[in-house]
Amino acid sequence: MGNIHIQTKSKEYDVYVGKESLSHLTTIVQNMQPAVSNIMIISDEAVASLHLQTVVDALQIDQKVFSFVVPSGEKEKSFENFYAAHTSALENKLDRNSLIVALGGGMIGDLAGFVAASFMRGIRFVQVPTTLLAHDSAVGGKVAINHPLGKNMIGAFHQPEAVVYHTPFLQSLPEKEWRSGYAEVIKHALIGDVKLYHWLKEEVQTLADLRDEKLIHILTKAIPVKANIVAQDETEKGVRAHLNFGHTLGHALEKELGYGNITHGDGVAVGMLFAIFLSEQVYKVNLAYEEMKQWFLKYGYPKMPSDLSVERLVGLMKQDKKANAGTIHMVLMQEYGVVNVVSIPDETVHIALEAFQKDMVEK
């Protein structure tokens, strides 16, 4: 098992990673001061059916534990479910000493975290991720819900008390969720750990390799990349934006195709390839785009759909949170491990995206 210490300006906490991590949950709760009055577990239907009782049983405490379960899927990260969770919290008499446990993937972590951030102006919460993708979202304190006009547009910065990454929970994931989460692992390697990138190319030949000790190794290498960036810039005023590598186009694809019709990781994978494609043009460097594309395709990541309107995608990219006064800002790569936020004119993005779309179709 590997423990990772997270330090930000507002809070310090630990991430417990391993096959026995759930055993720490009771101690985490018992050590909280002031003492926890009661616990609300927020989960989704798919995860709750598999793991909710396991977590309840692991909480060997006297306090009342109850659950709030929403349907599964990114579209459920909505104001309606956010409001309903508050109603449930009030009905079950949560107070300022209560604790919320986010049991699920990134959608649940975002939803439950924002409920915790806003209920009575902020109460404590613990992340219990059940997906590989959540190795990214569970750490760092960004919590949010979606708006019909944009992803993660309503939210806050609210750090958890701890993250309990019980790796056996991941074994029930379908392949598309392994692939989705692995995209964020690749992202962390490309922007902050070149040694990890080379290790992935050698050791992860198929998604089936993301198991057991290799999985724990990946998590204990990828999470510190994010932790180091968050320690420098907790509220995304500077270098934390580097974590959005691949996300400008990725989020646009999610919005255009409809949340749930493409996984977050698949969108980010296409977005990273486009960022590398554009970076080669902007910086006049060779980043081995063609080799990278074949590596991504080996894992089953999609190509950019040929029937999507480039003009519409550019419009959606202008709504990205990094955009400033309607100008697209993208995270581009100078070399592996070195990225920057760059202002890109609409016309440049449009021309590059058309060429990228054509390249993905023809090759």
UniProtKB/Swiss-Prot annotation:
It comes from the Bacteria. InterPro entries: Dehydroquinate_synthase (IPR050071), DHQ_synth_AroB (IPR016037), DHQ_synth_fam (IPR030963), DHQS/DOIS_N (IPR030960), DHQS_C (IPR056179). It catalyses: 7-phospho-2-dehydro-3-deoxy-D-arabino-heptonate = 3-dehydroquinate + phosphate. Its main location: cytoplasm. NAD(+) binds at residues 72-77, 130-131, 142, 151. Pathway: Metabolic intermediate biosynthesis; chorismate biosynthesis; chorismate from D-erythrose 4-phosphate and phosphoenolpyruvate: step 2/7. It holds the Pfam family DHQ_synthase. Gene3D superfamilies: 3.40.50.1970, Dehydroquinate synthase-like - alpha domain (1.20.1090.10). Its cofactor is Co(2+); Zn(2+); NAD(+). GO terms for molecular function: 3-dehydroquinate synthase activity; metal ion binding; nucleotide binding. Keywords: Amino-acid biosynthesis, Aromatic amino acid biosynthesis, Cobalt, Cytoplasm, Lyase, Metal-binding, NAD, Nucleotide-binding, Zinc. Binds 1 divalent metal cation per subunit. Can use either Co(2+) or Zn(2+). The keyword Acetylation does not apply. It is found in: Cytoplasm. Belongs to the sugar phosphate cyclases superfamily. Dehydroquinate synthase family. Catalyzes the conversion of 3-deoxy-D-arabino-heptulosonate 7-phosphate (DAHP) to dehydroquinate (DHQ). This is 3-dehydroquinate synthase. It comes from Bacillus thuringiensis subsp. konkukian (strain 97-27). The gene is aroB.
